[in-house]
């Protein structure tokens, strides 16, 4: 239990924290002056943390009220003040003390009771806690921690209070310090201002002191001067006085006594004199100073005036300086703005100068191009004039020959007899009959001679052909003309053609162009051969147009070409674009496509030509089939050759035709009519340089290239005909020369190719031993074909690629990996192909590559597509009629090529046998090679092209041998090439076989069906030979087509011309 003292201590404390009564009680007790209450309140000061229970607070309330009551009494007593009696005050104070003590005692009693009750409760709680041992320990620890925490809180509160106080004190100190700082700063500034003022005052005082020193020094000097002057005067006076005094001394001494009173008078006199002197000296000095002062004042006035004027000048100068400064700033700003404008103008002028220079360069290039074009057009015009003259001569000669030979021969001679009657009438109209008879008798031998004679006549006609390349091209062109002329004669009338075919071969290209009107005169003939090819084609609106258009292609070509360079352009363009898109090709695509397709030659154009740049490029396709067929149709069977003939004469004779049909088609069809004028013209002024170059854009490029325009184009235009052909396989070799190369790149390339164009036109015709004979004649003739081997070599990029690739497309299809290898191997074979081409130009060219250059190129897009499969058969079939029509002319070629043609036909037959077997494979394989070849072909095509070019030189060296050997050795060198490249031998043989199977079976089966169906319609005469030959050869040419289609697709892919394939697909779909 708690002691009473502790209870007393505890009783007073709870009032302060719990109820605030402690403080009130303390205040009242202080006012009352009761020390007991003061001590009680003091005892409560330590009791802050106690008072846990409400009992103590409740018990404290009565004492609080009592204390309040007693305090009010004490206040009343205090309010009375000292005015009351001391006794009353004492009595009251004692009463109050007693009351307070009683109240306290009562409060203590209450507190004790409450505390005792509280202690009892606490003891009960303690007992309960003791029973709960674990809980008791935790409670103690908890309470201890709570007490410690409370103490810490109190301490921290107190510390925080102290810190706050300290912070406040510090803030106050800081405020005082800042105030002192401000005051000190103000005082310092004041002191500094005072120091500056004092410094200024000191400077002024110093200046005044210096002036005063100067004045004092001057006054001292004057004083010293005056002193000396005065002393001197005094000395002088003394001297005077002494001098007088010496004489007067005695007198004075004597009379001193008497004269004592005179001394004073003397002194007075002296004084008067001295005063007079002093006055005088003073006046003089004053006057001197006055004068000096006047002078100084005048000088000061002058100086002040000068200073005033100087100050005015200074102020004026300052104003001027400010004005000049402002002007300078303005001028600087204007200068900067002008400099910025100048820099901007310079930049603009530089940009303008650059643009003007670019425009000047563009205009110079355009001017140069236009000059080249003008030169080419002039050359074409000259060539056309020469052609016109030759055609006029040929027309008369042919009319005579036709009249005489029709009377002499009569009707129905066999194509061989026709070729014997027609064979080689030289381009010279005077010697036509004699040389034709000689050519009839000695076919193969005389062909070379006729080639020479035709070359001579062509040289006579085209005097600009100076170079050997031009001569070779002229020979090739004359051969093409002779062949085409013979073919035209054959197509015009089998007997008349056979009788006059040599002449027409030599002249008909020009004559068909010039005669094409005449042949156009006989649209029946113009139609009949072509229409003999297909009544549907004859019926086709293209051919329905063809009578006029037969006239127009031939007339548009020949008359237009003969007529003017503009028409030379137009014939060329009419040939190239016009033929590519004109009746020839209008007929041709339609004719090529089918009688049904013939319904819309324009549609045939648009699907075949318009739809696909490849078909647009394969106007060679459209032309080679269509132009090959429809020129024959449009122009006549002769004109069916005349596309080649018109093309070849144009190609052979006119750079415009060679350029425009070939170039207009290749560049224009491929590029533009302007370029159509001359890919080589644009490519090389060399093509502009000579008609032969004009004839062979390639001729401008190289003799070998001059030997073959395609050589020029194929190496030059496309790195290889394969490349040039694949991009424009239909166009550049085929269509670029497709007017001629429509027959074949071979025609544009050389007479042999001009023959093979005819043969290319009728590779199926040329497929007939007749045209292989014609090719052998072309090859027998071919120094030009030896040229054409080069051409074929240069073709061979397409041809070598097409012989090997064209042959190996099937194997490339079957062995496309091998072909990738063998193409690389073929690059050697490109050499051997050059040989094989030199020897095979007839082989590969004659039916296969002659077709395949143009047709494979022309058809390569088509063969890549189903159109190639369908339309190519139609083309071959359409061509086969043309070839049959031409087969009438080829009889001489048949006689010549009977020997070579038979091995080819045998090979073709064996290919036919193999064709059905491989027919299905090639289809899949062609698609594979298309994908696979693109990989192999780009580099391999280049390698083969380079090697073919290399091989082209040797082949050019041995042109005649190769020409003769080409047919005899085609198989041998094919076997040699196969021996060289075992993969290639199979590729070559298979190419022949597989090419025959691939495209042939695609085309052959279709072509055999369609050609057989069309051949009976076209010419039953042609059908017997043409069908067999077409069947034998179409397989090979169609192979080359498939091969070249595959190769062209590879090279097209190489040349990034899958876009052409897409148009070809569209064209194929349109054709379908």
Curated annotation (Swiss-Prot):
Highest taxon of the lineage: Eukaryota
Q: InterPro entries from the entry?
A: DUF1388 (IPR010790), IF_conserved (IPR018039), IF_rod_dom (IPR039008)
- State the coiled-coil residue ranges: 98-132, 174-222, 293-380
Q: How is it modified after translation?
A: There are a number of repeats of the tripeptide K-S-P, NFH is phosphorylated on a number of the serines in this motif. It is thought that phosphorylation of NFH results in the formation of interfilament cross bridges that are important in the maintenance of axonal caliber. Phosphorylation seems to play a major role in the functioning of the larger neurofilament polypeptides (NF-M and NF-H), the levels of phosphorylation being altered developmentally and coincidentally with a change in the neurofilament function.
Identify the Pfam families for this entry.
DUF1388, Filament
Sequence segments annotated as region (55 X 6 AA approximate tandem repeats of K-S-P-[VAGSE]-[KEVTSGA]-[EAVK]): 278-643
List, as start-end ranges, the regions of compositional bias called Acidic residues. 455-487
Give the subcellular location: Cytoplasm, Cytoskeleton; Cell projection, Axon
Annotated region Disordered: the residues are 454-1072
Task: Identify residues that carry Phosphothreonine.
Answer: 832
Query: Locations of Basic and acidic residues compositional bias?
Result: 501-584, 600-620, 720-774, 781-953, 963-1072
The family classification in the record reads: Belongs to the intermediate filament family.
Q: What does this protein do?
A: Neurofilaments usually contain three intermediate filament proteins: NEFL, NEFM, and NEFH which are involved in the maintenance of neuronal caliber. NEFH has an important function in mature axons that is not subserved by the two smaller NEF proteins. May additionally cooperate with the neuronal intermediate filament proteins PRPH and INA to form neuronal filamentous networks.
Question: PANTHER family, alphabetically?
Answer: NEUROFILAMENT HEAVY POLYPEPTIDE, NEUROFILAMENT TRIPLET H PROTEIN
This protein is called Neurofilament heavy polypeptide
Source species, please?
A: Rattus norvegicus (Rat)
Lineage of the species this protein comes from: Eukaryota, Metazoa, Chordata, Craniata, Vertebrata
Q: Which gene produces this protein?
A: Nefh
